[in-house]
Amino acid sequence: MSKLIYIMGPSGSGKDSLMAEARLRLAAEAPVVFAHRYITRPADAGGENHVALSRAEFQLRLSRGLFALSWESHGFAYGIGREIDIWMESGLSVVVNGSRGALSAALQAYPELLPVLIDVPEHILRERLGARGREDAGEIEARLVRARMAVVEAPELVRFDNSGPLAERGQALAGLILETTISGRKS
């Protein structure tokens, strides 16, 4: 049974690495695809593999209804393409890299989605943000403040601890995705 699995978490929680690890483990196991995001950020900016768009191209796509979900964060625009609807209609479960701030809109558009909040202690967030070298000290502090923001509560919200070894946590996320896909349950 197809499901939309909405992964979210603060910068530095390890979403990109965790999703990449889970994707490797699910490659031949399940009818699951991982959606790419359209972002107004250069393709070589590091982090996830995404489709880089100019602001003008993003706005054009947005105005034509080509995004199933979209939001703004940290000075960039993010979109998830409408292709996810076709994938789910064909029986595939879809994993998306979402935003905590956009969860409410995502739940309105896809009430059956499974929201998964990637959670790590603040000291690990600080270490990871510093190690990736994309932000200065002030930007790191701002991201840590934002990390404390409340998440829209959803009855099926899964809080996923990502403070352990990547291989172990990636396997656990792959297991959650596989269980959700096979059983059709939300949690």
UniProtKB/Swiss-Prot annotation:
GO terms for biological process: 5-phosphoribose 1-diphosphate biosynthetic process; organic phosphonate metabolic process. The keyword Transport does not apply. Its EC number is 2.7.4.23. Pathway: Metabolic intermediate biosynthesis; 5-phospho-alpha-D-ribose 1-diphosphate biosynthesis; 5-phospho-alpha-D-ribose 1-diphosphate from D-ribose 5-phosphate (route II): step 3/3. It comes from the Bacteria. Disulfide bonds: none annotated. InterPro entries: GK/Ca_channel_bsu, P-loop_NTPase, PhnN. SUPFAM superfamilies: P-loop containing nucleoside triphosphate hydrolases (SSF52540). ATP binds at G9, P10, S11, G12, S13, G14, K15, D16. GO terms for molecular function: ATP binding; ribose 1,5-bisphosphate phosphokinase activity. It catalyses: alpha-D-ribose 1,5-bisphosphate + ATP = 5-phospho-alpha-D-ribose 1-diphosphate + ADP. Coiled coil: none annotated. Keywords: ATP-binding, Nucleotide-binding, Transferase. HAMAP family: PhnN (MF_00836). Catalyzes the phosphorylation of ribose 1,5-bisphosphate to 5-phospho-D-ribosyl alpha-1-diphosphate (PRPP). Belongs to the ribose 1,5-bisphosphokinase family. This is Ribose 1,5-bisphosphate phosphokinase PhnN. It comes from Desulfomicrobium baculatum (strain DSM 4028 / VKM B-1378 / X) (Desulfovibrio baculatus). The gene is phnN.
